[in-house]
Amino acid sequence: MPPAGLRRAAPLTAIALLVLGAPLVLAGEDCLWYLDRNGSWHPGFNCEFFTFCCGTCYHRYCCRDLTLLITERQQKHCLAFSPKTIAGIASAVILFVAVVATTICCFLCSCCYLYRRRQQLQSPFEGQEIPMTGIPVQPVYPYPQDPKAGPAPPQPGFIYPPSGPAPQYPLYPAGPPVYNPAAPPPYMPPQPSYPGA
C-alpha cells in the first residue's frame, strides 16, 4: 500500500499533467483554408509547434494565446454555407426549374410557336386540302437531247445504265391551255359580310 502522501499527490499530478499537457496536444494545430470578408480565398497553413490557429472565421493566424484559439471544429463550422451562398444556390435552382418548365410548356401548349412547329414536322402531308377539279394539267415533255453527244454516263446511285439515245420525235410547241369558259371558277368568291354592298 502506497504512503498517504503519494495517494494525495497522485490526483494533483494528474490534474497538473492535464492542464500542462493540453496545450502540448493542441499545439501545432493547422489553420484550414478560409474566405475573408471580401470573398478572397486563403489557403490553409500549418502552425509551428507550441502555437495554435487563432483568429476568426475571416482572418486566421498562428499565436500562443489560448483565449484566441479557434479549434478545427470551429473552423469547419465557418466553412458552412453563408446566407449569400445559400441565396445564390437557391436562385440558380429556381432559374433552372423555370427554364425547364418553360421549355416543356412551349412544346406542349398549342398556343406556342415550338408546339406548332413540332406538329408540322410530325405531319408534313396534313393541312388544308385544296380541290384540284377544273384545273387542267399540262403534259410533261422530256428535255431534248443532242444526238451528237451520245448516251449520258451513268450517274452514281443508279443501278441501271441508260438504254441508249431516246428516239427523236419532232418537237411541237405546247398549245394554249385548255380553257372552258362555261366551267365554274376554281374558287367561290367571298360573299360581302355587310348588307347593302
From Swiss-Prot:
Keyword annotations from UniProtKB, A to Z: Membrane, Signal, Transmembrane, Transmembrane helix
Domain of life: Eukaryota
Subcellular location: Membrane
Keyword Transmembrane: yes
UniProt signal peptide: 1-27
Record's GO cellular component terms: membrane
Cytoplasmic side: 109-197
Spans through the membrane: 88-108
Positions in the Extracellular compartment: 28-87
Membrane topology: Single-pass type I membrane protein
Family: Belongs to the shisa family.
PANTHER family, alphabetized: PROTEIN SHISA-4, SHISA
Protein name: Protein shisa-4
